[in-house]
């Protein structure tokens, strides 16, 4: 969460400096037509967007028999991973727009470890690979010419799989397990709240928080030395914070 706050602070500073620059540029201009073009209508106009930032997934209960055998009952926790998306959209009205985005999650993992009084230990690490395709809609509910606040929602599909690595140390003997689930296609959705402002004619910077649910990975069974090991079924959903640019066409 601290990393997300740092991302938010840096993004806000960047956006504020851009707004100050745009404001100074407008004040120094003697051509009133420049001011009108900066806040001109964008209805029936296309745009491209690029966003990047951080993601923290919700804590989730561990799956599989190994967790029960090792008495792992608490949730496995997420680090702050990278998330980004690109998309193309259309302004239906001045305050209403829609877009189609392709997003990804990288450098993210869920991790848990436990050490026992006798020196034995158990650890697990889940690393997801997520690609999403979402159709989104946004409404500007605060419109101060160059500065806007908007809310949005989107639905689509997420392609989710994960790698799982566990290590079990008992009596000086180390057992490791590595497994990869098959790709699974899930229903995905997002709910978002953000701000944007125009830093140049046809270029808008935005800072967006979103809650995203990508669904669960595929439940998988793998036979190792005659034993069946079950893993997968991890639910990936959580908080996203991204900054980016929107280019009007």
UniProtKB/Swiss-Prot annotation:
Q: Which Pfam families match?
A: OMP_b-brl
Tell me what this protein is called. Answer: Putative adhesin RC1281
- Which cysteine pairs make disulfide bonds? none
Cite the entry's keywords alphabetically: Signal
Keyword Signal found: yes
Leader sequence residues? 1-22
InterPro entries noted in UniProt = OMP/PagP_b-brl (IPR011250), OMP_b-brl (IPR027385)
Q: Which organism is it from?
A: Rickettsia conorii (strain ATCC VR-613 / Malish 7)
Q: What does this protein do?
A: Adheres to biotinylated epithelial (Vero cell) proteins.
